[in-house]
Amino acid sequence: MAFSRGQAGWALDLGTTNSGVACWDESLGRPRLVELPAVCRKLETSDPLEAPRLVPSVVHFLEKPGVVDRLGNWPPLARRFFLGQRALIGRPALERNEGVSHPAFVPTFKPALSGEALRPLARVGRESVTARDAANAFLRELLREIKKVSGQRVRDLVVTSPVAAFETYRAEVQQALRHLGVRRVRFVDEPVAAALGYGISLDHPRTVLVVDVGGGTMHVVLVRLSPKDAAAGEAAVLAKRGLPLGGNAVDGWVLNELCREMGHDLDADDDEVSRIWRRLMLAEACRVKEAVYFEQDVAFLMSPPGQTFRMETRPGGGTVRLDRERLRGILDQQGFYRSLAHSVEGVLEQAGLTAADVEDVLLVGGSTLLPGFFSFFEERFERRRVRAWQPFEAVAYGAACFAADRMDTLDFIV
């Protein structure tokens, strides 16, 4: 992707699990995700449903920063130059902590920014690392990668914001970005960005249900979008429900089910080796869960410690496999769709509306790809009202439209 001088429409969808950087591509008349090959999720695939261009929202602080690294954090220089490096972010940070999680690793920081910005999340030597420190380091290294790829320093940026976010969250993000030389920071509510990203015309008021299920949470928000509010990047919240239920919980359920089949008790041991193996097996459970989004069934390629890799001695022999039907059964058994139904019914009841009053249903977040998720909403709201084809990109795309003031140019959506 070519970048024009003074590139307009820079946007950041800062997520709990993954983050996306987008900008408005004037030559194509549409928003584009910015590929940051050094830190993005995957380099070997171009399938958008695997979110290859998103950046994992993780941070690993450098244990022994050099003189230049420390100098680069001095405020007068930080606003003008990216000297040295403070931390690893994205894929390199995950790879650095594969198997063993180091004290300097921060697996997530966004949830703490709203009210606990000074809460310690990691440690570098004898010094604690707070949520604020982690957010600052992540944003700093992300902007540095954008500069490497585009040749430009971002000075004007739109950041997406959850409708439930406190003003303290926005203040923390704004302060961090201004410290890094971003002169103009604007925010857009995630429902507004999702609507724009899915190509919804906001030339008249409409009632929209936004369902966001990512790695850690399930958010169901019913909003009223109007031209005036949308122009300010705001959505009128009619009702909302949130649960600490997302892809991470599903990974644990999958692992428990497959270990049960292998005859392994995950809770039997709690030593360091067992904890390391559990982290590795959770990562493998996540892999097979995501793989069955695209394949009918997938082999689980890791065995518990002390058991043979192929599990040939297990009754029935062969490898342990996961298929879509089995994953759907696990979700039903654990009450995933029951919780989703209660959330949807709850926001409708709270707002005094019915399913027929909802004009659009927007699905965002990687866990909306779970088997049965789309059909759940299709049965309740009809296929024509459900938009689900770009769960990873929609919010970032919409933020780029807002940043470039192209809210009335939505014919790039197919």
Where are these regions (language model features)?
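Conserved phosphate-binding catalytic cores of ATP/NTP-utilizing and phosphoryl-transfer enzymes
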Residues: M1-Q7, V185-V211, Q350, A394-L410
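Acidic, glycine/GT-rich loop-and beta-edge segments that sit at the periphery of enzyme/chaperone cores
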Residues: F3, L14-T16, L36-A38, G233, ...
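Active-site nucleophile and cofactor-binding loops and adjacent substrate-binding regions
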Residues: D47-E50, R186-V192, P244-L245, R387-Y397
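Glycine-rich phosphate-binding loop plus the immediately following alpha-helix
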Residues: D47-K64, L225-E272, P315-S343, C401
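Phosphate/oxyanion-binding active-site loops and adjacent basic polyanion-contact surfaces
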Residues: F105, V129-L139, Y169, V188, ...
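Helical "lid/coupling" subdomains associated with nucleotide-phosphate turnover
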Residues: A137, L258-G263, F294-I413
